[in-house]
Amino acid sequence: IGGEDNYEDYDVNYIPFDKTLGKFTKKKNLITENAKFDNIVYMHDYYILSNDWYQGFLKFGDNWDLCMNIIENKDGTRFRDWCVWDDPEFCFDTGNQRIVLPSYDYNKHKYMYISGGYWISKKYVMEREPLNENLDWGESEDVEWSKRVLPKYVYMMNEYSKVKLLKDKRLSAEVL
């Protein structure tokens, strides 16, 4: 990930990847295989960590399996962070399914999904439950994976840490 720049002065593991394969799921599974640490951040290149992101994690703690942070669009509005996919109370409007962003204290995890652009996981979770490499970006690979993992693991919202989008993205979710 990130290109072949000289990383000798940093603790970075460059992972070569044939871009013609085009599978985001394969790339993320390769990150898991090559990870040196227990906590792994999965994020697309259009996200950036806030300056106090790491301090927020130190304050939040390490008692989780899967974790999300606040995600902000360029204009400061919420983006797909604490996503609800199929809660009958919120997500169905005249028979159409919709994604909503509830308050951060929402805890009905069986109705949630983790958007594939950014999340944090313990390495053991991803080793036990890798992304389905038969699916790719835009094929609900994140929804399929979320529905497998969320019933089994502790998923928590860290409101002390924040990431921001480097480019404007359409929300496609209703903020409650």
Task: List each model region and its residues.
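Short beta-strand-to-loop acidic/aromatic patch adjacent to the donor-nucleotide binding site
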Residues: 37-48
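Catalytic donor-sugar/metal-binding loop of nucleotide-sugar-dependent glycosyltransferases
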Residues: 146-163
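Conserved catalytic core of nucleotide-sugar-dependent glycosyltransferases
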Residues: 50-130
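Active-site acidic short loop of glycosyltransferases
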Residues: 35-38, 131
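Acidic donor-binding loop at a coil-to-helix junction in glycosyltransferase catalytic cores
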Residues: 137-145
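Glycine-rich, basic loop-to-helix element that forms the pyrophosphate-binding segment
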Residues: 18-35
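Nucleotide-sugar-dependent glycosyltransferase catalytic core
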Residues: 22, 78-87, 137-138, 164-176
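Acidic donor-binding segment of Leloir-type glycosyltransferases
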Residues: 1-21
